[in-house]
């Protein structure tokens, strides 16, 4: 029988953290990556996930992780403080250009039209990476499984000449945290290569966070050496989690020491200090 004093003090203290085996990095060619995973997943609710995101974790489906790579710290968790955010000229033009898009917020759900757009996006933007061959089941596991407060947002162009007909332009998955919105994944019409739908989506999320009185929009990881991640550095001010502390980040000056040294100064939530 377990003595009462041996019970976890909180659900967060019941989590365990382990490091995965090395695997090829999906962001930087020739690099080897590892992840630190929080388990068991059924204990990670919205409150706990908020604390994990503050510590640099993200999720893919019900899999909650953060980079834990030997000798590399290219992945920097970043967030936008919405009240301090000031759009630049290009972002203001993008916002004005797409203001006619109609956004519909819904619970996570499968839609064949969404999946078709996802496959078009993967084939155009990430051909050969594996995700361009995702089955419907893989798509659902990746984007539509969540144990926290998550939403699906679809953006459509309405055609007034066609009696309410519309064209799906973008789909975005968002987590609602205690201190902000977390952008999980976004895919959009790849045929308009200069439409800047991804930028518009972040601007939309910033406005939503303001309306909900939430202070941050979490953008996942920024990787200086990855051209696909470069757009995140265009949002100012941008805060990064460096040496275990959130601070305003200057992407041109960011000095990123090896991950092992950084993690030693970045305690896990709930007082955890190591990886099993």
Curated annotation (Swiss-Prot):
Disulfide bonds: none
InterPro entries assigned: Acyl_CoA_acyltransferase (IPR016181), Asp_Glu_LeuTrfase (IPR017138), N-end_Aminoacyl_Trfase (IPR030700), N-end_Aminoacyl_Trfase_C (IPR007472), N-end_Aminoacyl_Trfase_N (IPR007471)
EC number of the protein: 2.3.2.29
Keywords: Acyltransferase, Cytoplasm, Transferase
Catalytic activities: N-terminal L-glutamyl-[protein] + L-leucyl-tRNA(Leu) = N-terminal L-leucyl-L-glutamyl-[protein] + tRNA(Leu) + H(+); N-terminal L-aspartyl-[protein] + L-leucyl-tRNA(Leu) = N-terminal L-leucyl-L-aspartyl-[protein] + tRNA(Leu) + H(+)
GO molecular function: arginyl-tRNA--protein transferase activity; leucyl-tRNA--protein transferase activity
Keyword Transferase: yes
Localization annotation: Cytoplasm
A biological process from GO: ubiquitin-dependent protein catabolic process via the N-end rule pathway
Protein function: Functions in the N-end rule pathway of protein degradation where it conjugates Leu from its aminoacyl-tRNA to the N-termini of proteins containing an N-terminal aspartate or glutamate.
Entry-linked PANTHER family: ARGININE-TRNA-PROTEIN TRANSFERASE 1, ARGINYL-TRNA--PROTEIN TRANSFERASE 1
The protein's name: Aspartate/glutamate leucyltransferase
Gene designation per UniProt: bpt
